[in-house]
Design a protein with these regions (language model features):
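Feature of Fe-S/electron-transfer and energy-metabolism proteins
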Residues: 1-242
Length: 242
């Protein structure tokens, strides 16, 4: 009942941002973006939107995966595909609001790519690397505010946990084993086996710990999901703990 109440609140709030009748600006502000000046860009955008009295939310999101081109700004405007701009500074940010959000000039010189297929602007799927990607775990990264649970739930978040709580723990482990899911570390250890070992360990009290620095030393490979979509991690831990 509590989840359904949360879901009924979250979905309309997310749909407000998906509303195609107004512009929405997203700013990548994970560690990679902040190191390149994303917080200053975020503030410049908010100041310009406020100065011009525009109904245009400016939202802080996580890492889209193109760290080499930070700071990234995504603008969704009616009549245009969602457009991602790279290496944005405060001057460019103000220009994007003036010329594109308020006007009709997409500012092609700053465009990195479109987030959807269209006939106007090359999309990310045309990139040699991105064309082969199908994001699953990282699908929300760079598209939602990681600090807003409504954004996560509005995109189907915690639905898997709700389903899992209606199953027996043994049944969940069986499903994970059948899926072939493996850990994200270098060993690729089967997740279902790991859960089964933990479940069979002696003692009633058990602990589930998140290793926030998995992978190659110093690479911080799990940064993206920790910063950009933490509720995905929390949902997985809740299912594993159950």
């Amino acid at each position: 009942a509590a989840f359904q109440e949360l879901k009924s609140r979250a979905e309309p709030r997310w749909q407000e941002l998906e509303d195609t009748t107004r512009s929405v600006i997203l700013v990548g502000a994970a560690t990679c973006g902040r190191a390149a000046g994303a917080r200053e860009v975020l503030q410049a955008l908010r100041n310009e939107v406020k100065k011009r009295n525009l109904d245009c939310p400016v939202i802080e999101v996580g890492c889209l995966g193109h760290c080499y081109a930070e700071p990234l700004v995504i603008i969704r405007k009616p009549g245009y595909p969602a457009i991602c701009y790279g290496r944005v500074n405060t001057v460019i940010a103000e220009k994007l609001v003036r010329d594109f959000v308020l006007g009709d000039d997409p500012c092609y010189e700053f465009i990195l790519g479109a987030l959807e297929e269209n006939d106007l602007i090359p999309s990310f799927t045309d990139f040699p690397r991105a064309g082969y990607e199908k994001k699953l775990i990282l699908k929300n990264c760079g598209h939602i505010d990681p600090e807003q649970i409504d954004h996560y739930v509005g995109n189907g978040g915690y639905a898997a946990l709700t389903k899992a709580l209606q199953m027996e723990p043994v049944g969940i482990i069986e499903q994970v084993n059948k899926s072939g899911l493996r850990g994200r570390g270098g060993a690729g250890f089967p997740t279902g086996q790991k859960w089964q070992i933990c479940r069979g360990a002696p003692g009633r009290l058990k602990y589930l710990i998140c290793n926030a620095d998995e992978g190659d030393p110093g690479a911080f490979m799990d940064r993206a999901i920790l910063e950009s979509d933490p509720h995905t991690l929390l949902e997985g831990m809740l299912i594993a703990g159950y």
